[in-house]
Amino acid sequence: MYSRVLSVAAIVTMALAVQAANSTAPYGNTTNSTGTTNGTNGTNTTTSSTATQSSAASITNFSSGAFVIAMIAVACSVMSL
């Protein structure tokens, strides 16, 4: 009885881990930020900068949430044996 409940919990938790991994690993996403500055002579200057998120930061974002959920799923599957 408990093994069946734990195996179902492992499947559900692994599905949550996959969803968390998809939402927290934005590979190749770019963020654009524009800023407007007003100089002393009255001219307006608009600057823009583009920051590309590296894969290392995405791996860090992945391991923060989804890795813990995946380990809970592994623990549930091992305990269901």
From Swiss-Prot:
One GO CC term, this protein: mitochondrial membrane
Composition-biased stretches (Low complexity): 28-53
Primary localisation category: mitochondrion
Its membrane topology: Single-pass membrane protein
Transit peptide: 1-20
Swiss-Prot/TrEMBL keywords: Membrane, Mitochondrion, Transit peptide, Transmembrane, Transmembrane helix
Region feature (Disordered): 27-53
Top-level taxon in the UniProt lineage: Eukaryota
Ranges that cross the membrane: 59-79
Subcellular location: Mitochondrion membrane
Protein name: Uncharacterized protein C27E2.11c, mitochondrial
Organism: Schizosaccharomyces pombe (strain 972 / ATCC 24843)
